[in-house]
Amino acid sequence: MNEVCEFLKKVGVYYIATVEDGEPRVRPFGTVNIFENKLYIQTGKKKACFKQMDGKVAEICAFKDGTWLRLTGTLVNDDRVEPQEDMLNHYPELKGMYKVGDGNNAVLYFKNAKAVFYSFGKEPKTITF
């Protein structure tokens, strides 16, 4: 999981795919953090993507320096204060838009996750968590 998190942080902007009414939705994201041995991302509860993610399977795709990552798993919303604080401490630039416990700040962690690193000419590397 640490390798996945570090890769996504290096990439900076990754893309997350969800489904809405049977149609694919892909958007850029940039938050990723490990808290209590779980990989978290962050968004707003008022956004359509939150409804597409909460309790559902999503997939992240990221590419850097000839290596790409596909991370698939179920996203679980965590309404506790502690993971919200931790995420905002790692991304202080978000504090202007989100506050801990504001009813909009959403941190979601991956459950039953499978990450596969691919690179041309190399065997894929799979990590589950």
Feature-to-residue mapping (PLM):
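Short, surface-exposed beta-edge/turn micro-motifs
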Residues: 11-13, 37-39, 55-58, 103-107, ...
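A short, Trp-centered hydrophobic/proline-enriched beta-strand micro-motif
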Residues: 6-20, 58-62
